[in-house]
Amino acid sequence: IDTKKFQSVFDYLMDWYLHQNVKFVIPIRELGRKRIFNVDEIKYFETYYNDLEIVTIDDQHFMAHVKNRYKLRPVLKSRWFMQVNQSVLVNMKCIDFLTDRNVILKSREVFPTSRKTLFQNHLLFEKFLKEQEEKELLKNGESKN
């Protein structure tokens, strides 16, 4: 099958996907530390290629991709997961879309290749952290009075 025929359709889908669902890219280690934000609940879904993680932060639901290091086929590793050090947080609405095996692979191919997207997402994540810090300061300020 010549996949180039579908490239425009796929570009359109990915544009929609990024606009609708991606909140920001968050480094897995930050999520692991649970530094500032309260993680109310974490649920894991294991799929053939990835672990999907439902994360609840301040009553908002996000979904993270966590690279499945154990079950990943070596052949796919370099091709699909090349620069992925991040897990991608998206709306939970997208769960059905993401649990489709092929869509996971295709979407993972697109995210890391766009450096611009990574930078934009990184800035959004920084902004998110600042907002959380400000919330904490306000909470602490109120409790002291």
Segments predicted by a language model, with ranges:
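Eukaryotic intrinsically disordered, low-complexity regulatory linkers and tails enriched in Ser/Thr/Pro
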Residues: I1-K34, V75, T117-N145
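Conserved binding/recognition cores within well-folded domains
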Residues: Q7-K106, P112
